[in-house]
Every structure is written in C-alpha cells, then in structure tokens.
Regions:
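A general structural motif
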Residues: 75, 135-136, 210-222, 282-286, ...
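Thiamine diphosphate
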Residues: 138-139, 335-337, 343-345, 349-355, ...
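N-terminal alpha/beta PP-like core and its mobile active-site loop of ThDP/TPP-dependent enzymes
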Residues: 19-362, 403-406, 487-490, 508, ...
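Active-site diphosphate/adenylate-binding microenvironment
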Residues: 33-36, 41-43, 59-60, 374-457
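Short glycine/proline- and acidic residue-enriched helix-loop micro-motifs
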Residues: 150-153, 205-208, 374-389, 532
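Short acidic loop-to-helix transition motifs that present clustered carboxylates
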Residues: 56, 76-81, 417-419, 541-545
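Phosphate/pyrophosphate-binding active-site segments
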Residues: 23-27, 321-416, 542-546, 551, ...
Length: 588
C-alpha cells in the first residue's frame, strides 16, 4: 500500500512540475487545456461557474492565463445550479467545471436536475491521470459511468487533439433536440499533452443523432381533422414549447381557433396569466378550470409535455373521453405514459408552424365549450386570501407581481412556496418561472437565482422564492454576490417546517409530523445573510408586508427578505397522488 501510494505520489509530483513549468506555445503546437479554453470560447461560452481542485488545476491555470470570466461557487452543486439558472435565462449553454472525485460527485444532483428539465449544460470535470484511472487513485471516481444515465452523453478525453471536436460536439448535443447536460471528463495528463495544430480536426459526424426530422404532413392533417371534429378541444403545453421558443406560434394558433390552453409547471408563461384562453396550471396543484377541462375534453392536443405524474396522476383515468394527440421532439416520450391516437415527432416550433399553414377548413368556434371554461374559472378562481393575524404567502406573491408589473424572473426552490409562486405570480412570458420541475431539487433556489442574475437584463429583476428548508441547503452561495455586482433578490417564506412534507403528513399520515419541524433550531436568517455579505430584513406583521417588499425591490444591491408565515398554511387545491384530475381537494 505504501509503495503504491509513494509511486503514485511521485508520479503526480513529476506531473505537477510539468504543470508548474512554463510551456512554450508556438503557432505550431498547443496543449490540452489551451485547446479546451479556446474551444469553449469558440462555442460562445461567456461565463463559467466552477470550483477548482487537484485534478482541475491545469484547467484553472489556463483560465488564469486567458483571463476567463469565471464565477467561484462555494460548492460544486451550487456551480451546477448557477449554470442551470444562467442557461435558462440566457437561452444558451451553461458551463460548469469541477475537479475529480468528490468535486464530480457533488455536481451530480445539479446535472440530474438539468437532465430532467432539459437544460443545456456542458460540465467539465478534471480527472486523475490516464495511468491512474481504475486504480483507486486519490480523488478518482468513475464519473463517466456515474453520469451516463443523467446526461445526453458523457465523454472522457483520451487524446488532447480530440478536445476541440469533443467540446464542439458537446455544445451541439446539449443545445439540440431535447436539450440537456453533457459531461466532458479531462484527465490531468491530457490537459498538458502537447499537440501539433495541424493534427487537429474539429469536424464531427453523429450518424445516430439526426435532429432534422421532416414533418409528417399526414399527421399534421390528421391533427387538424381531429380538432375540426371535436366539440371540446384543449391544448396542454409544456417545457418543449418553451425550449423551442414557440410561444408566439402557440399564441397565434390558440387565438386563431379560440382553443383553451392549460400548461405544466415548466410551461408557465407560454400564455400570459391574464390571457382569457389560459386556464392555468394543470395537475396536482392546478386550477379547477384546467383540471376539469382535462377530464371533459374530447380532443387533447399535448405539445411538449411528458404526461408526467404531476399532471396525469392517474393515467388510466386521464382525459378519459378524449382523442389523445402527442407532439414531442423526443420519441422516447411518445407512448411512454399515454398511448396517443395521433403522434407527431417534431419540435414544437416546427409542429405549430405546420399547423398554422393553411386554415382548418370548416372551423367554427366552440362557443358552448368556451362559455363552460369561463364558468368554471368563475366558479373556483385563484383567490388571494385576506391577511389578518399572519402574513399569507399567496398575498406576498400577488403583491410581488403588482410591484414588478409581472416582469420579474421568479426562481423557486422546491416545496409549498414553489406552488404558491406558480399559482399567484402573474407571469407574462415563457421561461419566466425557473424551478426544478422534474427532479424537485431542494437547494436549487439560491444558486439558480444567482446564475439567472448573471443573464437577466435591467427590465427583468430576478427574485428567488425560497423556503426555510431549501435556504439552509445552499445559502453559502450568497457569499459570491458581493464580488460580481449582481442584484438578485430573495424572499424566504419561513414557516419553520418542511412545508410540503408537513402538508402531506397532515393529509396522509394523520398529523404525525415526523422530523419535519425545525422550530427554534432555525438560524437567524437575517444575521446569516448579512454574514455572507447580503443585506437582509425580516417582516412578521401583515401591515408591513407591502412596504418590506417595496424596500427589497428598491434596494440597490442584493437583498434577502425573510417573511414569517404560519406553519399550517396549505397549498390548495390538491389532486391527491393516484387520483383523477377532477378529484380535487381544498377548492376555494
């Protein structure tokens, strides 16, 4: 054991000597890390989020040499979520860098979050030397095997001359088709390998990855015919429409034919909240109108949504009388949960463009169906409760919407506050609500808010809505804000419990609140935030809530506002897991 460690340590020191020495770079040669940084720049990377370590020092040395715009996270998970938040707002590939071993494993949750929500990321991990791989070297992890199930592809570079091609491929894969994360694992010796520039060829061919699907015009015609024959047509739209930037085509199509629309959590903002055709959120915490429409429709056109269990909790009794039409860019999603009557493999923008070509002959507005939707919206509207003794979180989100004219990027963590943000903020544009919709990652909120703030413009403030539980997971990332001049705002809705866990323990476990209450053990969030370099305040009186929100928004800098709410506040309505969408509880 000692000999193996000594031999590896000696070999590592020899490599370190090479790293530390100046490498003469002529116009005829380059080294792996220089090729890496140049390739990132060629692909349009403007900012990198990361955390250095032994196996990534060669990469970070090149960052120093080339003055790379890098944000030093306080944890690799934070770096991944920052890259995620940045990517969602910027509409480009986010880039994160880690070291090997624990650095790579720490970012796994962020990568899985991006994969579930189709966020384009390129994650670069340092790795031990190629001679040390498979020998349990210090900080070695088989990160390629670890990340293969949660990425679109996981590379390990075997020759430095391949780096330009691999980075080019990685960006293409991440940002095409169904978008998602890609891993590039770079061993230390590959980073310092010298390469003749004449040997580099960054061209690539991915014969098994063809995103140029021709639209099936027969399927388009069948969709139009099905809509024509329907008396109760309904559109269900999701993240696929957001990712393909097809919101205008969606709005044009819905309004041309006056078809009501419901959306998933990640489809928020595709229609403005006050659009009369927008029935609101579908599924577990969706609106009465949306869920009833899903159960009553006779023709459901799903574009860019997966029929996941938060929308279709009981697939056997979901849209039971409807002809099901599924449009998706990912063939694996079609028929996975709901077997469609008509399927169209296409991205949402292409599909909606084809559906807009030529009017549906003989179309007449479904006036009775539209009137029924208006009646359902009036029967159980999304009401903002009055505040008496305690601040109501619904009122906080409603007032925040008024104070920002519905123009803020809202970034949430996961839990009750996530649902209140979905229900009560008046969204106006797609991609405006950043949240961990698929994986449900607590701890996403703080770093994703920071990442989003690096990409947002002055017209769209960035506000993180965080629970006291999620804030405790990644609050350390607040410490970076003071170094970069960004101005994200954070609202902590503090109910002193794990709110959604608490709610489910009430509903399904006879009020047995097992290990879900923090009580007096919570830290002082104001002092904690200030210690991390961010101005903070706390509000407990309903009469002071609006002024506190106004002060937060007006402050010239980052700001944390802690809002104390009641621990028995519930998210309503709710479709219990496994129930049909019309079996809602807690209707107003």
């Amino acid at each position: 054991m000692g000999c193996l460690f000594y031999c590896f340590q000696y070999q590592g020191n020899e490599i370190l000597k090479k790293w530390g020495a100046h490498v003469e770079r002529t116009k005829k040669t380059s080294i792996g890390t220089e090729l890496l940084v140049n390739a990132l720049r060629d692909q349009g990377a403007e900012i990198i989020f990361g955390y250095p370590g032994g196996a990534a020092l060669h990469i970070y040395d090149e960052f120093f040499r080339q003055n790379v715009n890098h944000v030093l996270a306080r944890h690799e998970q934070g770096a991944g979520h920052m890259a995620d938040g940045y990517a969602r707002v910027a509409g480009r590939v986010g880039v994160a860098v880690t070291t090997s071993g624990p650095g790579a494993t720490n970012i796994v949750t962020a990568v899985a979050t991006a994969q579930m929500d189709s966020v384009p990321l390129v994650v670069i991990s340092g790795q031990v030397t190629t001679s040390g791989i498979g020998k349990d070297a210090f900080q070695e992890t088989d990160v390629v095997s670890l990340m293969t199930p949660i990425t679109k592809y996981a590379y390990q570079v075997e020759d430095a001359k391949d780096i330009p091609r691999i980075i080019k491929e990685a960006f293409y894969l991440a940002n095409s088709g169904r978008k998602g994360p890609v891993l590039v694992d770079v061993p230390k010796d590959i980073g310092v390998q010298e390469v003749a520039l004449e040997d580099i060829d960054d061209s690539f061919d991915l014969p098994g990855y063809n995103m140029d699907h021709e639209v099936d015009l027969g399927a388009v015609a069948a969709i139009k015919e099905a809509l024509l024959q329907a008396e109760k047509p309904l559109l269900l739209v999701g993240n696929g429409v957001v990712k393909s930037e097809a919101h205008q085509e969606l709005r044009d199509f819905a309004h041309r034919y006056n078809i009501p629309v419901t959306h998933t959590l990640l489809g928020i903002g595709l229609l403005a909240s006050d659009d009369p055709l927008n029935l609101g959120l579908a599924g577990m915490h969706g609106t009465y109108a949306a869920n009833m429409a899903l159960m009553e429709t006779d023709c459901l056109l799903n574009i860019g949504s997966r029929f996941d269990d938060r929308v279709a909790s009981n697939p056997d009794n979901f849209a039971p009388d409807a002809k099901i039409i599924h449009v998706d860019i990912d063939l694996a999603e079609i028929g996975k949960i709901m077997e469609p009557d008509i399927a169209l493999l296409a991205d949402a923008k292409t599909a909606l463009g084809a559906l807009l070509q030529g009017a549906i002959a003989g179309w007449s507005d479904k006036t009775d169906w539209l009137a029924h939707q208006a009646a359902n919206q009036a029967l159980h509207p999304t009401r903002v409760p009055e505040m008496t003794d305690a601040i109501r979180p619904q009122a906080v989100l409603d007032y925040l919407g008024k104070a920002t004219d519905g123009q803020a990027y809202i970034v949430t963590d996961v839990g009750q506050h996530q649902m209140w943000a979905a229900q009560y903020y008046p969204y106006q544009f797609p991609g405006q609500n950043l949240t961990s919709g698929g994986l449900g990652t607590m701890g996403y909120g703080v770093p994703a808010t920071i990442g989003a703030a690096f990409a947002a413009d002055e017209k769209h403030p960035v506000v993180g809505i965080i629970g006291d539980g999620g804030f405790q997971m990644t609050n350390q990332e607040l410490n970076i804000i003071q170094h970069y001049g960004i101005q994200p705002k954070f609202i902590i809705l503090n109910n002193t419990v794990l709110g959604m866990v608490h709610q489910w323990q009430h509903a399904f476990y006879s009020d047995r609140y097992s290990h879900s209450e923090f009580g007096s053990s919570l830290p002082d969030f104001v002092k904690l935030s200030e210690a991390l370099g961010v101005k903070a305040a706390k509000v407990t009186d309903p009469a002071d809530m609006q002024a506190a929100v106004d002060e937060m928004l007006a402050y010239d800098g980052a700001y944390v506002l802690e809002v104390l709410i009641d621990k028995y506040e519930r998210v309503t309505p709710m479709v219990p897991s496994g129930k049909a969408n019309n079996e809602m509880e807690g209707l107003s």
